[in-house]
Each structure stands twice: as C-alpha cells, then as structure tokens.
Regions:
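S-adenosylmethionine
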Residues: 1-227
Length: 227
C-alpha cells in the first residue's frame, strides 16, 4: 500500500501524538523570498498587488494569503525580484550567517532558491560556488542566478567528490541540501509517497553521508557547514 512504510514509522516514532498531529488543521502555505540584490523586503511588500504575511522563518520571506495565486507569472518574478520558495526552505541559508567577502559553497544547489539567498548575503562581494550534479538542473540553476542578478557566482556541474578535490579546505561557509527521501513532498506529490520505502531511505542516507564527507573536505579550518 502506498505510504504504508512511512505511516508505520510515524506511528512508531510519535505514539499517541500521531492522532493529535493529523487531527490538527494543516493548510498548505506557499511563500516567496525577496531577492536582497534587487530590493528590500519592505519595498517589495509595498509594491506588489497581492496579499502577503510576514514569514516566521526568514526576514526576507513572506507567506501568500491567496492559495490560488500564481506568483511565478508576475513581472517581478521574471525580473528576479523574488523567488517562489517553500516557507521552510528559506531557513537554512540564514543559519550560515554569510557576510560579504566570504567564500561560500552551495554543494547541492539546483534549482537555486537557497543559492540566491546566499548571493544576497554576499552583496556581490566574495565568491559563491553553486554546484548541480544533474546537467539539466544545473542549467536551471544558472538561469535562475542570472535572473536574480548574481554576478559573483561560479556554477558547476560536477560530482561532490570532484568539487572537494578542486577546493580543498577552501570555503568559509558551505550549505549542503543533500538529496533526500522526499517526505516534505508528500502533500504536493502523491508519487513521492508511493515511491517511499525503507530501501530509499537507506540509499539517501548513504548518499548524504558521502556528500557530507566531501563538503567537510572543502571547508576551511574553523569554517561553518550547514547540512
């Protein structure tokens, strides 16, 4: 049965809290993150013609009040003023505390939402290396960074091992959003639930551990890594 393994694991981990969790209303919230290279969040909120609420996850992000809105069609999106991003996805980049002038690596960067946040924090100073292992997704990454006005980024299409070999102990900050078993996609993608299994979880865990080793090799002593 689709999702049988996942439900069994949830029940085992949550116990009596499982029923409480699923009894609570759980509306899907969609969000956008403002590109600090284009404008300030306050300027964006004052300029757009659709409803927004401040996001609890990121100062540069907003929640959409209209679930039917298609922000990707807005002119400001095409101009790189904002990025359509899951609200929770706006969190990791901010944890690194990136500052202008630093050397930053986004090791699993495609399609580029978190990468654009790192770029905004750099303010055009320093170096941002963004890697996408799948060629087609690396192309999307490149396109998105161009749209967002990022000028100090190097986009790669390499294995994480080759990136680590090319940049030993080099980066001040590294973000690793490794491929995962996709539980966060279940509400939007029924196929993700159907494909979920213990074998997939084990496979993703092994891959994540390997990528994390490569990331550590590229981090300078005293640097900061967010996984």
């Amino acid at each position: 049965m689709p999702g049988e393994y996942f439900e069994a694991r949830e029940r085992a981990l949550l116990g009596t809290r499982y029923d409480v969790l699923y009894a609570a209303p759980c509306a899907v919230r969609r969000g956008v993150t403002v590109n600090g290279l284009r404008c300030a969040p306050q300027e964006f909120a004052a300029a757009v013609d659709f409803g927004l609420e401040p996001s609890p996850f990121c100062d540069a992000a907003f929640l959409l009040t209209d679930p039917q809105l298609r922000p990707g069609r807005h002119a400001y999106h095409h101009a790189g003023v904002f990025y359509v991003q899951e609200p929770s996805a706006s969190v990791p980049a901010g944890l690194l505390g990136v500052r202008p002038g630093e050397r930053v690596l986004d090791l699993c960067a495609a399609p580029g939402g978190k990468t654009s946040q790192l770029a905004a924090a750099l303010r055009g100073e320093g170096l941002l290396v963004a890697n996408g292992y799948v060629a087609a997704r690396a192309g999307v990454l490149k396109s998105n960074l161009e749209r967002m006005g990022v000028t100090n980024a190097l986009v790669l299409n390499e294995s994480t091992a080759r990136v680590a070999a090319a940049f030993p102990a080099f980066f001040d900050k590294i973000l690793v959003d490794a491929p995962c078993s996709g539980e966060g996609m279940f509400r939007k993608e029924p196929e993700a639930l159907r494909q979920h299994s213990a074998a997939l979880v084990a496979q993703c865990a092994a891959l994540g551990a390997s990528i994390l080793d490569d990331a550590a090799a590229a981090l300078r002593p005293g640097g900061l890594l967010c996984y």
